[in-house]
């Protein structure tokens, strides 16, 4: 298979996944559709190295990982997270519940390595899945490498319906209070909706100088420093270099060296994500029907234990912080899918319950900020850190 043939096939599969997800309003996740198509291809006529043949090979994959995670760090606004500290705490405690049950009951039943591999993907997104899959592959644990990917692919099927149900219960409570006059709708002022640009140590470059090369150069330098320091500290602090990339992304943006969302500004984000998604599905080349049948029970068990721990702890902390148990659980559930499903599910719930535009705006203003912060806290930040720590347990 030629380079362009392989590239076209890989992108067609990813595109079909997106189309199905859009048509079903994210009820059927794009990653699930793509995973099924890749499995069918690998079991029939795809060459096992189709992703590598498409040009997505190790050097560019590693580069995209470093740049993407550093980019993710620039998205972190300490001020925004501080304003939503209760949502942040609920999301983190929910993840704590996942870890508590998967690493105790899950590890006891399915084995320590199985729990270690599957837990980080369950607390976040694609980056955590890739970190754990690569670690398992490096140790010759091919079956567990596939488990990391399958966990990432399947967890949304648990998260979507549960979140939708929780948000509808919460929405009914809110809309009843709004219609009775018990809850007021305070529309945010335009100044509150606009992003506050804090003073930076390093002034922002004029827009005309924010070219693709300049933006990527600064992002690359930041990742280089992060990985260099992480490598130097590895004998003393055994944390993945990806964690340092996340931290240095935060610092670089805070001081003004790197702009917020540099990959988006440079027009590179879509291609970087494409590289990572293609790479994660490449791991399914080793997934035989027999292997998947063997993984079905551990997969289901780890997800059940994780979600059970999440619901218990998130509802407890939510009650202590003044949230309803449904809203608290919904915030924690964002760990299973992140953005954009957290936005889509919230909007769908608001549309279903609202009788007019004002009621929809009210419901969105009450639920969406918490859902967005929950997804950002879990998928963008916590999952990378957890995966960076858990790889040392193997």
Q: Which ranges hold each PLM region?
A:
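Intrinsically disordered, low-complexity non-transmembrane regions of multi-pass membrane transporters
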Residues: 1-11, 167-216, 348-370
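Structural signature of hydrophobic alpha-helical transmembrane segments
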Residues: 1-9, 53-67, 113-122, 236-248, ...
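Structural signature of multi-pass alpha-helical membrane transport proteins
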Residues: 2-58, 72-74, 197-269, 283-285
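Small-residue-rich segments of transmembrane alpha-helices in multi-pass membrane proteins
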Residues: 32-44, 66, 90-103, 120-130, ...
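Hydrophobic alpha-helical transmembrane segments in multi-pass integral membrane proteins
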Residues: 45-47, 101-108, 133-136, 141, ...
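Entry/N-cap segments of selected transmembrane alpha helices
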Residues: 58-64, 72-104, 216-220, 270-276, ...
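Juxtamembrane and boundary regions of transmembrane helices in multi-pass small-molecule transporters
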Residues: 103-111, 151-197, 316-323, 375-394
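Alpha-helical membrane segments and immediately flanking helix-loop junctions
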Residues: 109-150, 154, 162, 324-378
């Amino acid at each position: 298979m030629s380079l362009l043939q392989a590239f076209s096939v890989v992108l067609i599969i990813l595109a079909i996944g997106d189309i199905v997800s859009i048509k079903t309003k994210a009820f059927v996740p794009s990653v699930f559709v793509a995973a099924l198509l890749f499995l069918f291809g690998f079991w029939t006529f795809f060459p096992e190295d189709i992703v590598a043949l498409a040009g997505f090979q190790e050097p560019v994959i590693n580069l995209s990982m470093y740049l993407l995670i550093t980019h993710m760090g620039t998205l972190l606004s300490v001020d925004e997270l501080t304003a939503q500290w209760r949502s942040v705490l609920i999301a983190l405690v929910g993840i704590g519940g996942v870890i508590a049950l998967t690493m105790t009951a899950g590890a006891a039943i399915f084995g320590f390595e199985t729990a270690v591999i599957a837990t980080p993907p369950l607390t976040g997104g694609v980056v955590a899945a890739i970190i754990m899959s690569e670690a398992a592959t490096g140790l010759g644990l091919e079956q567990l490498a596939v488990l990391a990917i399958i966990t990432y692919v399947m967890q949304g099927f648990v998260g979507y319906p549960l979140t939708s149900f929780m948000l509808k219960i919460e929405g009914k409570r809110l809309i009843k209070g709004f219609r009775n006059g018990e809850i007021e709708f305070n529309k945010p002022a335009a100044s509150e909706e606009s992003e506050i640009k804090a003073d930076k140590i390093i002034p922002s470059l004029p827009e005309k100088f924010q070219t693709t090369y300049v933006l990527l150069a600064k992002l690359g330098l930041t990742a280089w420093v992060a990985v260099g320091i992480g490598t130097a500290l590895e004998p003393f602090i055994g944390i993945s270099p990806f964690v340092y990339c996340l931290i240095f992304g935060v610092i670089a943006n805070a001081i003004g060296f790197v702009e917020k969302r540099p990959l988006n500004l440079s027009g590179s984000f879509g291609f970087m994500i494409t590289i990572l998604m293609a790479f994660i599905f490449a791991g399914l080349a080793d997934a035989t029907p027999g292997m998947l049948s063997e993984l079905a029970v551990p997969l289901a068990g780890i997800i059940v234990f994780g979600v059970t721990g999440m619901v218990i702890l998130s509802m407890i902390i939510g009650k202590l912080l003044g949230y309803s148990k449904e809203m608290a659980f919904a915030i924690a559930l964002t760990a299973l899918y992140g953005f954009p499903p957290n936005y889509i599910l919230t909007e769908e719930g608001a549309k279903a319950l609202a009788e007019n535009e004002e009621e929809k705006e009210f419901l969105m203003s009450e639920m969406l900020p918490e859902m967005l912060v929950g997804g950002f806290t879990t998928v963008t930040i916590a999952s990378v850190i957890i995966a960076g720590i858990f790889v040392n347990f193997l």
